[in-house]
């Protein structure tokens, strides 16, 4: 953002509005006109070295940014609120505004104030909005997280059948993806990508069926005119954007996909105004190509963020050993979208295995990778006119590192994925890389307007201009020496004043050498005669004077021209630069996962198309690292085998019982995380792992409510459980924890019981089901694929020791009172709880589970028959009658004691 000279504000003029006649300056009239075209954005109005905001924009911005709110002039009799931010710090303020959900229209001066004056004294400098800054269209380094993609997503929908598709684009890297979706998958597909901004047609935005999804997203949802999403116009829009005559090389897209592509491109053109970020060609993602993880599961497993929204404590943080921004983004992408093709998974695992087998070489690769800057984002900034010399320097630095990596890999026998990456690196534009090395100085300024970024010797005219600018005294002294030698006048001087500028001065006695001949007169032009001296100039000196006066401006002009030349060359090589950068990210992720595997003792999983799920000595990747950091006891590894018990059979279900604090939830989560890690192409925290590809992963772990939507914790649990039971199939993995705990005991037991039956008979999937309803363990007698396992504990001196070991069998207690004591409940409460528990256990009737088991046809309710009433014996009747006849309030202590002896005697006879 270049500094501009602020024009003098013209006098106010009459502006008769509908409310009342007011006097507005031409500048304020211009502001109001531009603001009227950008009502949904804060308007950054350029005035000299500041962006100023007025009216409601100023009030909102001053509050959001914590800057002073002042006033400037009046409108309709009221003071006009105003605030401003300096241009040089604009990115910092934009970052804060975007983070708070604002959109910003950047309005620049598009002509010099001197030009405006030529049109008249009251003319205002022309201004125009050059860009709309929105959450999904950021390119500035300060506004972006280097480890996180910044996706703009657009949703397309066709009339009639209502078919849906999604497009997501990161204009900071050029990534461009497209996929079809369905109404029931829409929310999950949006949250998998986690866009910064979602653009939808205004008709879809107000659709009653879709609106709940938009309300849930919690991101910036931007409705746009439906005409932008016209699938019929999409082909022309795509051809124009990519500057191609035909889309034959782009593949075939469905109508909803074309609608989404059209809306995304139209929005980019709208926000970037005259600039066109270079994008990759749209890449289609096919349904079923990645592991489906619904939003609730994604949140409960804390893949990219914890439940509180932090990156620390997430699985991504625990496994990230990347050293480049591109590598970090690729790792996050792989984690959030694991593969379902064993062949593709094996390609990634082969890369990690190779890196583990070539540790010395990989250490050298990682040293080179640490020097790789964010090339795609630097390229994007250059392409949209927001780049600087350091972005060109980033490309040069990246090329150098890529060259070093190519040299290290020369002759290496690489697995397929890494071999393809090496090939892309070797195809980087070597000529352009050499050009950058020749052109760019070693130390680069942040802004191109500062100059000094072109290497000395690259451009002779620039060197001359710099010499004139920086060494004018030496140049003048050199010319003076030339003239002394030419004329033989040793007292000749070149001097300067504000009237004549530069001139040659000689004494009157020595002036003959410059005036005696016609040749001398034409060479030395007389300027002024003094009492004792004469002054001359030459064509050469006059040109030099002009050059010196304009040297700084000319030097900067030459540098800016070179910058534009290099930028154009970079954009011309965009495809090969991005391909090389992507290849470097692949090497970064592969070596990082190898470092993780070596550091944490992970094993290579065997992934195939079977229904196997056999984890030996599995561990929770996040908890294990946390325990190591705390120097606590080592993590207790556990096996998990949900594989079919016979050939051709369905996956197994483990019913897990055990105490609170015993580690049930950790065990459930760790197996889900191991599946995700395996299918993203990572080694896993286990002794060994054989995993049949999971196509859908569902997890209902942990309790949370949704008060904003009027949902209790139990209601949220039931909604999520319903989604699992309605969608899980034989290749799915289901993790359920404490289903039914949020309601009355028998209600909860009934729901949990029926859910397990349904998973076993209808979904027929692999599942882990943790519960405190110990009656459910009886299900193993009738459900052939269900096994009981429990978390082992050891009781010692009225306390309980959690062993965190999973063993076959069933628990008969939950040790809740002991856990309450550990949590610090008052001793009186703990003691009373223990007494109540003993009384409840003593009065508990037996046989409930047996009655449920005997009633299996599936899903039927418990038989409504009552237990036969026991036959009352005569002696029992006599005792009962005696007790019934007692009036406790009328007995004296002596009578009460006698009565006790009598009742004891009757009881003995009975």
Swiss-Prot record:
The processes (GO biological process) annotated in the record are:
mismatch repair
Query: What's one GO-annotated cellular component?
Result: cytosol
SUPFAM superfamilies linked:
DNA repair protein MutS, domain I, DNA repair protein MutS, domain II, DNA repair protein MutS, domain III, P-loop containing nucleoside triphosphate hydrolases
Give the InterPro entries listed for this entry.
DNA_mismatch_repair_MutS, DNA_mismatch_repair_MutS-lik_N, DNA_mismatch_repair_MutS/MSH, DNA_mismatch_repair_MutS_C, DNA_mismatch_repair_MutS_clamp, DNA_mismatch_repair_MutS_core, DNA_mismatch_repair_MutS_N, DNA_mismatch_repair_MutS_sf
Give the superkingdom in one word: Bacteria
Please give the SMART domains that the UniProt record associates with this protein: MUTSac (SM00534), MUTSd (SM00533)
Biased composition (Basic and acidic residues) is annotated at: 1-11
Its signal peptide is none
Q: Which UniProt keywords apply?
A: ATP-binding, DNA damage, DNA repair, DNA-binding, Nucleotide-binding
Q: Which residue ranges are recorded for the region named Disordered?
A: 1-21
Write down the PROSITE patterns for this protein, in alphabetical order. DNA_MISMATCH_REPAIR_2
A GO molecular function assigned to this protein is: ATP binding
For ATP, which residues are the binding ones?
Answer: 658-665
Q: Which Gene3D superfamilies match?
A: 1.10.1420.10, 6.10.140.430, DNA repair protein MutS, domain I (3.40.1170.10), MutS, connector domain (3.30.420.110), P-loop containing nucleotide triphosphate hydrolases (3.40.50.300)
Summary of the function given for this chain in its UniProt record: This protein is involved in the repair of mismatches in DNA. It is possible that it carries out the mismatch recognition step. This protein has a weak ATPase activity.
NCBIfam families per the UniProt record, alphabetical: mutS1, PRK05399.1
What the record says about family reads: Belongs to the DNA mismatch repair MutS family.
The molecule here is called DNA mismatch repair protein MutS
Q: Which organism is it from?
A: Brucella abortus (strain 2308)
Gene of origin?
Answer: mutS
């Amino acid at each position: 953002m270049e500094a501009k000279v602020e024009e003098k504000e013209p006098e106010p003029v009459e502006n008769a509005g509908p409310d009342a006649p007011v006097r507005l300056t031409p500048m304020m009239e211009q502001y109001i006109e531009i603001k009227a075209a950008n009502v949904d954005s804060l308007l950054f109005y350029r005035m000299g070295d500041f962006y100023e905001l007025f009216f409601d924009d100023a009030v909102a911005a001053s509050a959001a940014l914590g800057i002073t709110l002042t006033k400037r002039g009046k409108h309709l009799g009221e003071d006009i609120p105003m605030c401003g931010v300096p241009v040089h710090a604009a990115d910092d303020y934009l970052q804060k505004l975007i983070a708070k959900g604002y959109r910003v229209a950047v309005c620049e001066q598009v002509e010099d104030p001197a030009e405006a004056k030529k049109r008249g004294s009251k003319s205002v400098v022309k201004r125009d909005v050059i860009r709309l800054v929105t959450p999904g269209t950021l390119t500035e380094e300060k506004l972006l997280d280097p480890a996180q993609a910044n996706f703009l997503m657009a949703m397309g929908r066709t009339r009639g059948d209502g078919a849906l598709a999604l497009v997501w684009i990161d204009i900071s890297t050029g990534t461009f993806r497209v996929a079809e979706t369905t109404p029931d998958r829409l929310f999950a597909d949006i949250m998998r990508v986690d866009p910064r901004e979602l653009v939808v047609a205004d008709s879809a935005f107000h659709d009653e069926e879709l609106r709940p999804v938009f309300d849930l997203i919690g991101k910036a949802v931007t409705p746009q005119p439906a005409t932008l999403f016209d699938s019929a116009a999409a082909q022309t829009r795509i051809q124009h954007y990519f500057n191609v005559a035909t889309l034959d090389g782009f593949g075939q897209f469905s109508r909803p996909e074309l609608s989404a592509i059209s809306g995304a491109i139209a929005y980019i053109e709208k926000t970037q105004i005259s600039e066109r970020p270079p994008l990759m060609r749209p890449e289609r993602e096919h349904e079923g190509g990645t592991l489906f993880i619904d939003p609730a599961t994604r949140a409960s497993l804390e893949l990219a963020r914890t439940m509180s929204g932090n990156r620390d404590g997430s699985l991504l943080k625990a496994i990230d050993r990347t050293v480049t921004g591109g590598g970090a983004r690729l790792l996050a992408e792989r984690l959030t979208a694991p593969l379902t093709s064993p062949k593709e998974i094996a390609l990634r695992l082969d890369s990690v295995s190779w890196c583990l087998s070539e540790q010395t070489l990989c250490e050298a690769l990682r040293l080179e990778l640490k020097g790789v800057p964010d090339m795609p984002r630097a390229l994007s900034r250059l392409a949209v006119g927001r780049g600087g010399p350091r972005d060109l320097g980033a490309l040069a630095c990246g090329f150098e590192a890529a060259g070093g990596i190519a040299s290290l890999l020369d002759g290496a026998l690489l697995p397929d994925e890494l071999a393809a990456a090496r090939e892309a690196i070797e195809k980087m534009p070597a000529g352009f890389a050499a050009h950058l090395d020749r052109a760019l100085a070693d130390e680069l300024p942040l802004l191109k307007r500062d100059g000094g970024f072109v290497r000395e010797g690259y451009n002779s005219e620039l060197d001359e201009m710099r010499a004139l600018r920086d060494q004018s005294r030496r140049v003048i002294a050199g010319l003076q020496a030339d003239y002394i030698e030419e004329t033989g006048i040793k007292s000749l001087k070149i001097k300067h004043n504000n009237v004549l500028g530069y001139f040659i001065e000689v004494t009157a006695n020595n002036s003959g050498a410059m005036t005696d001949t016609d040749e001398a007169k034409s060479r030395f032009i007389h300027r002024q005669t003094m009492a004792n001296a004469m002054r001359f100039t030459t064509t050469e000196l006059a040109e030099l004077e002009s050059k010196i006066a304009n040297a700084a401006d000319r030097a900067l002009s030459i540098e800016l021209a070179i910058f534009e030349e290099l930028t154009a060359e970079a954009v011309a090589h965009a495809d090969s630069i991005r391909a090389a950068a992507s290849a470097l990210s692949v090497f970064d992720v592969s070596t990082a996962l190898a470092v993780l595997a070596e550091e944490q003792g992970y094993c290579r999983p065997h992934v195939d198309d079977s229904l196997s799920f056999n984890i030996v000595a599995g561990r929770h990747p996040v908890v294990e690292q946390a325990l190591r950091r705390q120097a606590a006891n080592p993590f207790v590894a556990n096996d998990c085998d949900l594989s079919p018990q016979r050939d051709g059979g369905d996956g197994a279900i483990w019913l897990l019982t055990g105490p609170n604090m015993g580690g049930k939830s950790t065990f459930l989560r760790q197996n889900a995380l191991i599946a995700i890690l395996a299918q993203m192409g990572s080694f896993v925290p286990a002794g060994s792992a054989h995993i049949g590809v999971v196509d859908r992963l569902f997890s209902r772990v942990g309790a949370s409510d949704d008060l904003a939507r009027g949902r209790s914790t139990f209601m949220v649990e039931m909604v999520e459980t319903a989604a699992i039971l309605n969608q899980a199939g034989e290749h799915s993995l289901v993790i359920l924890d404490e289903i039914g705990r949020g309601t009355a005991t028998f209600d909860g037991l009934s729901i949990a019981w029926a859910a397990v039956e349904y998973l076993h008979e209808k979904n027929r999937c692999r599942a882990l089901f943790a519960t405190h309803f110990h009656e459910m363990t009886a299900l193993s007698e009738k459900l052939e694929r269900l096994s009981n396992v429990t978390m082992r504990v050891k009781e010692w001196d009225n306390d309980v020791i959690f062993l965190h070991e999973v063993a076959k069998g069933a628990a008969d207690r939950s040790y809740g009172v002991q856990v309450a004591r550990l949590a610090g409940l008052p001793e009186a409460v703990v003691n009373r709880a223990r007494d109540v528990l003993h009384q409840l256990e003593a009065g508990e009737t037996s046989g409930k589970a047996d009655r449920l088991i005997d009633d299996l046809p599936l899903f039927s309710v418990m038989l409504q028959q009552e237990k036969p009433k026991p036959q009352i014996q005569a002696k029992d009747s006599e005792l009962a009658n005696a007790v019934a006849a007692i009036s406790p309030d009328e007995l004296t202590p002596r009578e009460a004691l006698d009565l006790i002896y009598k009742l004891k005697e009757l009881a003995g006879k009975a």
